[in-house]
Amino acid sequence: MGRFCTSTIILLVLVFAATVAYQPTALAQDYNKQNLEGVDFSGQDLTNDSFTKANLTNSNLSHSTLEGVSLFGANLEGANLEGADLTYATLDLANFKNANLTNAILEGAFGFSARFPGAIIDGADFTDVLLRPETQEELCSVAKGTNPITGRDTRETLFCY
């Protein structure tokens, strides 16, 4: 009987320790179609979150990790994305009118039908971003600078010649 109690207590302690030690990974957040106008997401890890068709007008996403995020059809007019990491993000049909993308990393993002009128892209890295030819021309007309993280020249990442 004593051996049974000792074994049971040890088992309970191990189960409790395993439960306390287990840290579940964060699940991606769903912000689809939400009105997030002016919301401050600066410096946050938003990896794989979804902002499909969300209103992010004048929101602050500066220095945020947005890797793999869906911004499909989102309105980012006037948003601050300075220093944001948008690697492999879905940007198709997103509106970046007058957005600040200074030093942002957009490597591998899909943005074929994204719009960038009046966007500030100084130092932004567009390596392997799929864009429409007319969007590429528009961005090349204002492209300048070098991304401080990747060391890549904005004009070179856009193939501006």
Residue ranges of model-derived segments:
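Tandem repeat scaffolds
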Residues: G2-T8, L14-Y161
